[in-house]
A protein has these predicted regions:
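Short gly/ser-rich loop at a beta-strand->alpha-helix junction or flexible surface loop bordering the NTP-binding
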Residues: 2-7, 18-19, 23-217
Length: 218
């Protein structure tokens, strides 16, 4: 066997091991990760739970070393939140998965709103801040993200429970984003609001109704 063949085989084995490490305690189906990376699934037991109850974030304790996190990020398997923590792109594919990820980052007894709520509803690039409705103030960053607190009134009709979190409805989320955008953020905010309206089928009249019900939305 030549050196190049040996190196290729070692690289393939390492590539597969990295993917297996991500599946802590075999809670997630292996086939999804191997298909993402274009690999061939290993022969494993099919008796895996339907619901993944493992924590949605990966940390140092879940991986052999810090190099693994960077490697997984470069492979497109995980999204890094900071130098020590990340979440799986596989988990972020569903509404419940995104809510579970956000629940780990959000302070207790708070409501996800604005950009954070938009990510829960739509997915996409993870927001730079954790936007919440709360009466408390948080000065410490969480997983590399600043906690942005909005001390607003949120009627029961404007929030809903998604898995483990409470989040503003798509209509209220669009209003929060539109009423608080700046000239610098107007273009991306407009795109997000249009996506929310298209995905969840609400109209400008619905937004006007929300604004009438919450006079302190700004």
């Amino acid at each position: 066997m030549t050196f190049s063949q040996t190196g290729l085989r070692q690289a393939t084995v390492v590539h597969k091991v990295i993917h297996i490490v991500v599946l802590r305690n075999n809670h997630r189906p292996l086939i999804h990760f191997f298909r993402e990376a274009g690999g061939t699934p290993l022969s494993v037991s099919a008796t895996v739970p339907r619901m993944d109850t493992s924590p949605p974030l990966l940390g140092d304790a879940d991986l052999p070393g810090p190099i693994c996190l960077n490697r997984l990020h470069s492979l497109g398997v995980v999204c890094k939140l900071d130098n020590d923590n990340a979440y799986s792109y596989h988990d972020s594919r569903t509404l419940y998965g995104r809510a579970s990820i956000i629940s780990t980052l959000m302070p207790s007894r708070s409501v996800a709103c604005a950009g954070t709520a938009a990510w829960v509803w739509l997915g996409g690039m993870f927001p730079n801040t954790i936007d919440i409705i709360s009466k408390a103030h948080y000065r410490t960053a969480r997983y590399g993200r600043k906690v942005s607190v909005f001390n607003r009134q949120a009627p029961d009709e404007h929030v809903t429970d998604v898995g483990p979190i409470t989040v503003t409805t798509p209509t209220r989320t669009a209003c929060d984003l539109a009423m608080n955008c700046t000239p610098e953020t107007q273009s991306p905010v407009t795109e997000i609001v249009c996506m929310l309206m298209q995905e969840f089928r609400f109209r400008p009249d619905d937004c006007l109704q929300v604004m009438q019900e919450a006079t302190h939305i700004r």
